[in-house]
């Protein structure tokens, strides 16, 4: 079994090794040329999009428009049935 003194010595050598390794790689990365993360700025000028045309080439008929308008009708048109009555219509 490993005693406490040996484990402390092994841990100390391991930490010393990590410190030397860290210092070595820190100096080698600092000696490298810096890497350009972003490229040079674009030379293309930005312009806003053109307004829509006045002619009807872009116009499309929405075939679903009538379906969308009448899609949800919970009751028939007009006043609600049974308002003002004690018993709603159809009650026994």
UniProtKB/Swiss-Prot annotation:
Transmembrane segments: none annotated. Residues 31-70, 86-92 form a propeptide. One of its GO terms (cellular component) is apoplast. Keywords: Apoplast, Developmental protein, Hormone, Hydroxylation, Secreted, Signal. GO terms for biological process: nitrate import; regulation of root development; response to jasmonic acid. The mature small signaling peptide is generated by proteolytic processing of the longer precursor. It comes from the Eukaryota. Residues 70-92 are annotated as: Disordered. Residues 1-30 form the signal peptide. GO terms for molecular function: hormone activity. The modification Hydroxyproline is found at residues 74, 79. Induction: Induced by jasmonic acid (JA). The keyword Signal applies. Extracellular signaling peptide that may regulate primary root growth rate and systemic nitrogen (N)-demand signaling. Belongs to the C-terminally encoded plant signaling peptide (CEP) family. Interacts with CEP receptors (e.g. CEPR1 and CEPR2). This is Precursor of CEP12. It comes from Arabidopsis thaliana (Mouse-ear cress).
């Amino acid at each position: 079994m490993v005693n406490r003194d040996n484990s402390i010595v092994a841990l100390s050598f391991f930490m010393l090794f990590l410190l030397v390794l860290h210092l070595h790689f820190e100096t080698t990365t600092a000696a490298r040329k810096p890497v350009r993360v972003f490229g040079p700025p674009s030379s293309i000028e930005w312009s806003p999009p053109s307004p829509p045309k006045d002619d009807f080439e872009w116009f499309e008929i929405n075939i679903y428009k009538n379906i969308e308008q009448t899609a949800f009708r919970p009751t028939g048109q007009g006043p609600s049935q049974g308002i003002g009555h004690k018993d709603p219509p159809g009650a026994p």
